[in-house]
């Protein structure tokens, strides 16, 4: 067993506030990613959505090839790759249009359509649609390709036994760059493996949980999505448990968590069986009254605002132009 002591205390936590969003026309959110501009993209039971923090936008049409369950998302430049129930789709986010793929071409041909297999993962470092419907998670490691499937865990096609006898379905894989270990989420348990992938330790406090997704923030907090809510493991191995409470609108909307994603601002996005949820660590807005910038009570009705690359602000309004840099008195 590993030398790392996994002493964990489970805490039922309700103090942290979740902001929940119901998508128009979709219920289950199964994949989340973010583009270079900060836009959040969502794979759902009905197709692709984007979300700008205010509104959701659907990118599918009913009864077409893109009206389909989306299991995984991955960006390569502005091209968004989608692992779906009918194979791989490609959406050019810049042009806001779908690109022709075998899955698109097969949609109108019943015989070819039946041959399309469900795709659950995307290999963004290899052939993106290389894996069949039995593969639920992949991870490139120093030792080779780690694959989680219906039949268990494999490294370079060599089985790794997690338990005696029949192997569990492996739903989620992640490398922990802070703890220098690998996390393996299965139907029934969460395992931690050393970098050699030789020694495995089961996290006893999570026994019996179906672990569906894993992600980590910059402070080393590990987010674990399960059929029993969301868990957060801190660096000291304490465990917090977030669950739905119908009496509290600031809790997660559903206890079945399909996907969790830490964005570039360290907000944690959670895809559930009942929509999208966000645990915010980043404040989207910073409010500064105009008199604190201009040191004047004259006021200004602003019509245009520009921020330069070096962080300076230019603001134009009914009472003239304001030039402002943080820490420097405004000029106007």
Model-assigned labels for residue ranges:
Residues 1-332:
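Carboxylate-rich, polar loop motifs that coordinate divalent cations or form catalytic acidic clusters
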